[in-house]
Amino acid sequence: MQGRSLPFRVATLVTGLLECLGFAGVLFGWTSLVFVFKKQHYFEELCELDAGSLGNATGLDECRARDERFSLIFTLASFTINFMTFPTGYIFDRFKTTVARLIAIFLYTSATLTIAFTSADSAVLLFLAMPMLAVGGILFLITNLQIGNLFGKHRSTIITMYNGAFDSSSAVFLIIKLLYEQGVTIKASFLFISVCSAWHVGRTLLLMPRGHIPYPLPANYHYGLCSRDSPPEEDKKEAESEKLELQSKEFLSPKKETPGQQQAPGSFWSHTFSPRFAWHVVWLSVIQLWHYLFIGTLNSLLNNLASRDSAIVSTYTNAFAVTQFFGVLCAPWNGLLMDRLKHKYQEEAKRTGAVAKAAALRSVVPSLTLTSLLSLGFAVCASIPVLPLQYATFILQVVSRSFLYGCNAAFLTLAFPSEHFGKLFGLVMALSAVVSLLQFPLFTLIKGPLQNDPLYVNLMLVLLTLLTFIHPFLVNRECQRKESPREVA
């Protein structure tokens, strides 16, 4: 039965990867789309109003109001993609996969149709379309992440690969930009994306479960087209019993635990107010703010560094979008690192009698540290106003971002009880979304009082990035304390 279901599971894996790669995170290709919108004269009336109010406005800042409008749209959309993770996660938990995906398809298709029929006269509709596109995309990702549960020991690798595909999908807007330069209209491109909704519906009905894919995976588990061959009720009960047994083996110490060692998972609020969770929120929020501010203001930054030379701006915009595609290649390395270290530390725990769960949590510390280090390098390069250096900035940005979200999901999985994962994941994304709203006032500060000089803002954010190293340090110290003989005795 397992052999017959393997090709079906591989088909689910591959089509899920294509869905994340082609649709889920297209919002983060915003820079390419802004280039096209400017060519289409979106919000151009703001340039005329701004120039009229300033009287003697220079060519450098005469379109400041338009840049702020585009930045505001991206700020709202990026805020929505994180903040709505909490309610969309609840929808996924409560109403299961099929309902969540149908909602995603409705929002996504509505967004692409709105963009397709938007013009310079109705550009304000982007404030509605981009957040809908963001929420539909994140629901695609959330419903696909569970596919990792089908592949056991490769689970972390697949989860991080899907997060990398989510990042790489920003290259879709580069394709739209290149097609536009070859004469294909925005309307035609987004109508094509809208038609692809038929593919999403077909995949939802044929290749995805109606409910959730459990982890660990019970014996004789079937879904989608294979669900008609599902085992009878007795076998389902036996599979559920095996699932519970696997879960106990996954998280219990290699040593026999006495009743005193078996602890209740604790309430949701006890974990929410723990230092471990608080520092993780800081770690994610600071790094994510850097990425969102960079993506949302990149077009303006390139215009300033290139003295508003449209050809140079287009070249660097294309380079940035191309590097985003490689996120899907970078992210699995993070998952492989965590899977290998988890196996290594748990084997050591078996020999020494240490707590297995602490050993598993320890496996994410190198990934947390490496992500902070990559983000620091990205922040430093982004702060140096040298145009050719931005190629290095683009590379560091895509690598650090591809590590960021996979590491976030892995940490929450290992650091907190599984029954609270959905709520904690949604909460950490919602809190980081609130912090991400700072990108618009920071952009306004740079464009206004700082007169297009982001030096002081960049220095402040670089210093904040240094704070993210505290998180892996504290997690490592906690793991060492739990693995000590005094703790496990």
From Swiss-Prot:
Q: Give the catalysed reaction(s), semicolon-separated.
A: adenine(out) = adenine(in); guanine(out) = guanine(in); hypoxanthine(out) = hypoxanthine(in)
Principal localization? membrane
Q: Name one GO cellular component term.
A: basolateral plasma membrane
Task: List glycan-bearing residues.
Answer: N56
Where are its TM segments located?
A: 17-37, 72-92, 102-122, 123-143, 158-180, 277-297, 318-338, 358-380, 402-422, 426-446, 455-475
Task: Tell me the GO BP annotations in alphabetical order.
Answer: hypoxanthine transport
Q: What topology in the membrane does the UniProt record assign?
A: Multi-pass membrane protein
List every position bearing Phosphothreonine. Answer: T258
PTM annotation (Phosphoserine): residues: S253
Q: Which controlled-vocabulary keywords does the entry list?
A: Cell membrane, Glycoprotein, Lipid transport, Membrane, Phosphoprotein, Transmembrane, Transmembrane helix, Transport
Q: Name one GO molecular function term.
A: fatty acid transmembrane transporter activity
Q: Which InterPro entries match?
A: MFS, MFS_trans_sf, SLC43A3
Q: Where in the cell is it found?
A: Basolateral cell membrane
**Which Cys-Cys disulphide bridges does the record give?**
none
The family note in this entry says: Belongs to the SLC43A transporter (TC 2.A.1.44) family.
Briefly state the protein's biological role. Sodium-independent purine-selective nucleobase transporter which mediates the equilibrative transport of extracellular purine nucleobases such as adenine, guanine and hypoxanthine. May regulate fatty acid (FA) transport in adipocytes, acting as a positive regulator of FA efflux and as a negative regulator of FA uptake.
Matching PANTHER family, A to Z? EQUILIBRATIVE NUCLEOBASE TRANSPORTER 1, SOLUTE CARRIER FAMILY 43 MEMBER 3-RELATED
Can you say what this protein is called?
A: Equilibrative nucleobase transporter 1
Q: What gene does this protein come from?
A: SLC43A3
